[in-house]
Curated annotation (Swiss-Prot):
Enzyme nomenclature, EC number: 3.6.1.9
Organism: Salmonella phage PMBT28
Name of the protein this chain belongs to: dATP/dGTP diphosphohydrolase
UniProt keyword annotations, A-Z: Cobalt, Hydrolase, Metal-binding, Nucleotide-binding, Zinc, Zinc-finger
Top-level EC class: hydrolase
């Protein structure tokens, strides 16, 4: 028996790469988290065209992935084109294309989904509104607690690199640190690469990074710091000596009364380097092993 189905006129969806569809869906999901559901329906065509052009420009510069989301610029551009397609078919009043002779100019305030009428002065600049707290909390990749960001990073890494190891992640971190150095510490994307790897390594090691940082900062707040000759800083202890190599410990048992009670005295000395400590020990104790 031969099956018959009339598909004439139907869209050949098999021509679309499903991975591209998934990438666009991820862009849309992040957009909803960042701006709210269907926020784009209040935008104007010209604004969306600007966004699409920016992503295409990044592709022309061989920058394939968006720094903020980590997703492909092609998927970002496609999502913007989809919005434009929908608005042109369903909300023709959104069509404010600058170079269309049939459309009067509409001035829109950036950062808002509603057009702002011109002031009486005509060309007066409109103030840019500060983002509301509720909106800022929805940002997916740039706000939240350290624990939130660590969870976000590890979730992505688990899906993308499920077989990664701590050693491999540390090796990658070293490479990213070199790239950050090459960029003269001016590239936000390189900073983000280093931070992402640090948080993922901590997650792989089972470290609650938020608690670890809080505990360490409590210690740092109590320390006194001094600048060293190489420009770095080291915390200072014991009346001004800097922490260096672990100290040599001396223990002495001193009698305190005729009954035989003793007082244990522990003394230590710190050294600036391992060679200094070894030299001091040899001078004091000869070849006897500690």
């Amino acid at each position: 028996m031969t099956g018959i189905k009339f598909d004439q006129g139907k869209a050949p969806l098999s021509l679309i790469d499903p991975r591209f569809t998934e990438e666009v869906a991820r862009v849309l999901a992040i957009g909803e988290q960042k701006y709210g559901r269907a926020n784009w329906q209040g935008l104007k065509i010209e604004r969306l065209l600007d966004a699409v052009k920016r992503h295409v420009l990044e592709l022309e510069k061989s920058n394939d992935h968006d720094d903020e989301t980590g997703l492909h610029h092609a998927a970002h551009a496609a999502s913007g084109l989809m919005f434009i397609f929908w608005l042109l078919n369903n909300r023709p009043t959104s069509d404010d294309r600058r170079w269309s002779a049939a459309v009067p100019g509409v001035r829109e305030q950036r950062g808002s989904v509603q057009p702002v009428p011109d002031s009486e002065e005509g060309l007066d600049m409109q103030p840019v509104p500060a983002p509301s707290p509720s909106r800022s909390k929805k940002r997916a990749y740039s706000t939240g607690t350290i624990a939130d960001v660590q969870k976000l990073i590890s979730g992505w890494a688990d899906r993308t690199f499920p077989d990664r190891t701590i050693g491999e992640a540390i090796l990658k971190l070293k490479k990213e640190l070199a790239e950050l150095d090459t960029a003269s510490y001016l590239d936000a994307g390189e900073f983000a690469d280093v931070a992402i790897l640090l948080l993922d390594i901590a997650q792989l090691a089972g470290i609650d990074i938020a608690t670890a940082v809080a505990n360490k900062m409590a210690i740092n707040e109590r320390r006194v710091w001094q600048r060293l000759e190489d420009g770095t800083h080291q915390h200072v202890i014991d009346g001004g000596r800097t922490d260096g190599v672990d100290p040599i410990i001396r223990v002495a048992m001193l009698p305190t009364d005729p009954t035989g009670s003793h007082l244990c005295v522990v003394c230590g000395q710190r050294f600036g380097s391992e060679d200094d400590r070894a030299s001091h020990y040899t001078t004091t104790h000869g070849d006897r092993k500690p």
